[in-house]
Amino acid sequence: MADTSIILPPGLPQVIIEREFAAPAQLVLRAHLEPGLLARWLGPREMTMTVERYEARHGGTWRYIHRGPDGQEHAFRGVFHGQPSAAGIVQTFEYEGTPGHVKLDTTTLQERDGVTLLRTVSSFQSVDDRDAMVASGMERGVRDSGERLEALLATLTPVH
């Protein structure tokens, strides 16, 4: 439907990601909260994903591993803060390869006429941390994820 917008506010330790999906917020939320669906779209398209733990509730923890075609593994973990809903999914995010460099992601979903705007604000501990994440190839992973999520959403049926 639309391209992904990635904004790096100058001098601020944030990344703002926005993308519209031709799907109701309920489906976009479901794709974010069900581990089996999450594994089908999150991350660069050439990587496979294994969800080890995904407790989408206040205080719940999560951990997943991306594996590249070369077998190299990249593990990530975090904690949910508050009850995840379309009004907000708040969670920490840490790449285990760089422990201690934790960011806070706040994702909101706004639906209008069957189109959902997904907006994620990632707050880093410093501009240097943000810039290191961007330099690691984050943009390609974010764009691949958006395209893969759009394709997945087209296959899902809303639950009434």
Stretches with model-predicted labels:
Residues L12-E18, M49, T61, A75, ...:
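Intrinsic-disorder/low-complexity, polar/charged segments enriched in Ser/Thr/Lys/Arg/Asp/Glu/Gln
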Residues M1-T48:
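Hydrophobic ligand-binding cavity/cleft-lining segments
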Residues P69, E94-G100, V121-D128:
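Short, solvent-exposed aromatic-acidic interface loops
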Residues A25-Q26, A56-R57, H81-A87, T108-L117:
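A short, structured loop/turn motif at beta-sheet edges
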Residues R19, V51-Y54, F76-G82, F93, ...:
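Hydrophobic/aromatic beta-strand elements that line small-molecule binding cavities or substrate pockets
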Residues V28, L38, W62, F80, ...:
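Hydrophobic pocket/interface hotspot
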Residues Q125-H160:
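A conserved amphipathic terminal alpha-helix motif
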Residues I16-I17, G36-E73, H160:
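Short beta-edge strand/loop motif at the mouth of beta-sheet-based domains
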